[in-house]
């Protein structure tokens, strides 16, 4: 019963349910509106032009549709006047009010969401040798995927995460199902690491599946690039943040 609960409804599992995305994006809008109001009041003191960009679909458009920053850029948001630099922010629950965290280069991870489909041969659990088990194969794949980060990446340079968050397969305790699918997420702060993770993901999934005589398919669902802070602009803005917030409140 939170006071800011959304009144919107959506369909989930065939039923109408309340829908809310409580990531703080309403705060982003309020912050940008307030910034625009303040800068408008001192516009004669600003040696240049400032453009305020309100981005819809901040976390991506619905499947099959265009939206977010990519569509805005395509439609000319960075033109007339041309944009030389962009500064943005994201609220963070781990920081107290008045505190700022920033760093040069990668600050928020790239996201790649994927689906793995496995197809075997259904059989009764009492005679597993007469079928091909996608559940055993899935277990081997999940375990093997954990070695991507721990054994294939230089973690002293940047972090990365590979997560399987959802597995769906089977309907009874004594039936080995024909198929199964898994949903997962990759997060990386370095493009070379991302390429390595994607390469190793495919090697592991297809080779483990083949070793179990299982058909496998990987589908990439969503891809967001790294949020990257230009090192020059980072150095330019740092003194201002320290002056406004106090050095002790700026975390690097």
Locate predicted features:
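Residues within alpha-helical segments
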Residues: 36-37, 70, 139, 185
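Residues within well-formed alpha-helices
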Residues: 34-35, 67, 137, 208
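Conserved strand-to-helix beginnings and helix N-cap segments that scaffold or border functional pockets
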Residues: 32-33, 65-66, 99, 128-131, ...
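Metal-dependent amide/peptide-bond hydrolase catalytic core
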Residues: 136-252
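Histidine/acidic-residue-rich, glycine-tolerant segments that coordinate divalent metal ions
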Residues: 2-20, 27, 44-166, 171-175
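Active-site alpha-helical elements of protease catalytic centers
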Residues: 21-39
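Hydrophobic residues in beta-strands and at strand termini
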Residues: 40, 118-120, 188
């Amino acid at each position: 019963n939170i006071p800011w609960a959304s009144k919107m409804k959506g369909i989930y599992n065939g039923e109408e349910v309340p829908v809310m995305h409580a990531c703080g994006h309403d705060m982003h809008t309020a912050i940008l509106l307030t910034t625009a109001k303040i800068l408008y009041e001192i516009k004669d003191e600003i040696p240049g032009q400032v453009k305020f960009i309100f981005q819809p679909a901040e976390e991506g458009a619905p499947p099959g549709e265009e939206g977010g920053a990519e569509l805005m850029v395509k439609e000319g948001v960075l033109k007339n006047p041309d944009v030389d630099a962009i500064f943005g922010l994201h609220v963070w629950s781990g920081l107290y009010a008045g505190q700022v965290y920033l760093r040069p280069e990668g600050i928020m991870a790239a996201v790649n969401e994927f689906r793995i489909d496995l197809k075997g041969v259904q059989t009764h659990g009492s005679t597993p040798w007469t079928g091909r088990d996608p559940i055993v194969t899935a277990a081997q794949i999940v375990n093997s995927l954990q070695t991507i980060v721990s054994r294939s990446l230089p973690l002293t340079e940047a972090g990365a995460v590979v997560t399987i968050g959802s597995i769906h397969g089977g309907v009874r305790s004594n039936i080995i199902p024909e198929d199964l699918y898994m949903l997962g997420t990759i997060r990386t702060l370095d493009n070379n690491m991302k390429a390595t993770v994607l390469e190793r993901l495919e090697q592991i999934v297809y080779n483990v599946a083949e070793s179990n005589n299982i058909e496998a398919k990987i589908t990439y669902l969503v891809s967001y690039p790294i949020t990257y802070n230009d090192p020059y602009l980072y150095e330019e803005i740092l003194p201002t943040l320290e002056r406004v917030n106090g050095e002790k409140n700026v975390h690097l």
